[in-house]
Amino acid sequence: MGSATPPRLQKFPATAPADDIYAAFKQDGCVIIEGFVPPDQMARFSQEIQPAMEKIQVQVTNDGNSNDRVKRFSKLVTTSPTFRHEILENDLMHELLQRVFSKPGEGLGYHFNDTMVIEVQPGAPAQRLHRDQELYPWWNSMGPNAPECLVNFFCAVTPFTAENGATRLVPGSNRWPELTLINAAECPQYGNIESAPAIMQPGDCYMMSGKVIHGAGHNATLSDQRRALAFSTIRRELRPVQAFPLWIPMKIARELSPRTQAMFGFRSSTQHCDVDTVHFWGNDGKDIGEHLGLMSSA
């Protein structure tokens, strides 16, 4: 919505109390966390995925497609040891997600929807403004007070600047009275939306609600390849974009911690109902991890 002053993104160091970061997330729907991934981890991760990134051909479509001059790569857990053994073991990420999705005594209330590297090439146009929860179209209709369905952690692998396509965020758009699609026909604020660029250094990230309006900015540079690492997480009741257990080899799955195995669908989550305990993604009422022969997480 139009305002007298440009919107401002709240920022916290990764050492700040999780409750403070979560409060800012609840208020604005997005918050920048500085130093979320240690720079040395991010540098090693970037080196490990570089050969795969170099094999991806850049598409130039000039048709408004979100892949126009953008590289995307999702096979991170099978490509990068740093990703699966270090970056995914981020305790702050889980502290925040527990506050968003989980109930006491019920384990993880969430799992990964997708994990992806997104690299915006020089000359790439600005992305269409959107809400990520449009993946589940009915969620917008439930309005701003509905539970979160999706939370993104979007990490800078290379510097994010206003010039090279830093994501444009609209803080507070998670609380707009109507969560409509962002287009001329359905959004009363269309053409009058003020956004702020997420300026970040490698290792910084923004945590974002699926309700928040955002879009990659235009990369107006001649040589900057703006590289990001995105974790998309969803409620355990929802189906993810990536069929992780069908393409992650068991050899890799066995290397993961029990918590990360659950995030990728190799373990069940539980919910306590009035008369019983239900295993989501289970096997005959038991943890799917037992069927797969994974060691006990107890």
Curated annotation (Swiss-Prot):
Keywords: Dioxygenase, Iron, Metal-binding, Oxidoreductase. Transmembrane segments: none annotated. Its EC number is 1.14.11.-. It is an enzyme of class 1 (oxidoreductase). Fe cation binds at residues 130, 132, 214. GO terms for biological process: terpenoid biosynthetic process. The record marks 150, 232 as: Important for reaction specificity. It comes from the Eukaryota. One of its GO terms (molecular function) is dioxygenase activity. Disulfide bonds: none annotated. Substrate binds at residues 72, 127, 167, 226. It catalyses: preaustinoid A1 + 2-oxoglutarate + O2 = preaustinoid A2 + succinate + CO2 + H2O; preaustinoid A2 + 2-oxoglutarate + O2 = preaustinoid A3 + succinate + CO2 + H2O; berkeleyone A + 2-oxoglutarate + O2 = preaustinoid A + succinate + CO2 + H2O. Its cofactor is Fe cation. It holds the Pfam family PhyH. Pathway: Secondary metabolite biosynthesis; terpenoid biosynthesis. Belongs to the PhyH family. Homodimer. Multifunctional dioxygenase; part of the gene cluster that mediates the biosynthesis of calidodehydroaustin, a fungal meroterpenoid. The first step of the pathway is the synthesis of 3,5-dimethylorsellinic acid by the polyketide synthase ausA. 3,5-dimethylorsellinic acid is then prenylated by the polyprenyl transferase ausN. Further epoxidation by the FAD-dependent monooxygenase ausM and cyclization by the probable terpene cyclase ausL lead to the formation of protoaustinoid A. In A.calidoustus, the austinoid gene cluster lies on a contiguous DNA region, while clusters from E.nidulans and P.brasilianum are split in their respective genomes. Genetic rearrangements provoked variability among the clusters and E.nidulans produces the least number of austionoid derivatives with the end products austinol and dehydroaustinol, while P.brasilianum can produce until acetoxydehydroaustin, and A.calidoustus produces the highest number of identified derivatives. This is Multifunctional dioxygenase ausE.
